[in-house]
């Protein structure tokens, strides 16, 4: 089993990321999260580089107050660097699973390190990892 787990990489199981610009409103982010049916969105700057993560909890917290959600940009409420846990496509799935458990989060951005910052190239979720482990079990590892 250990040998099999050491051959499961993020690149083979990652899914398409849902990214939003740091200037969009909280209201628009709520609509987008609902339409895309995701629990986390990755926030990028004008250079398409990762600057934050936006969770359901962030959006819910913002909507509880009396603020006008159309006038608040998501960069006010998002989790910012360096408090973002991320992974690369070359990481082992088992290591990413451990990060998700340790941080008690549902997904991670898959990033490519560039000279200017981190480019979001995918996402890995608890569901992606569960599918991989179920497939491994079905193969009889």
Where are these regions (language model features)?
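Bateman (tandem CBS) regulatory domains
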Residues: 4-17, 72-84
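Short beta-to-alpha loop/turn elements within the nucleotide-binding domains of ABC transporters
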Residues: 8, 24, 54, 72, ...
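The conserved cystathionine-beta-synthase
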Residues: 19-37, 44-45, 85-106, 110-113, ...
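Terminal peptide-recognition signature
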Residues: 33, 48, 77, 100, ...
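Short beta->alpha transition motifs characteristic of CBS
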Residues: 38, 42, 50-65, 105-106, ...
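A contiguous binding-surface segment within folded domains or other stable secondary-structure elements
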Residues: 69
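Short, acidic/hydrophobic/Gly-rich beta-strand patch recurrent on exposed beta strands
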Residues: 76-78, 111, 123
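Short, solvent-exposed loop/turn segments that connect beta-strands within catalytic domains
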Residues: 113-119
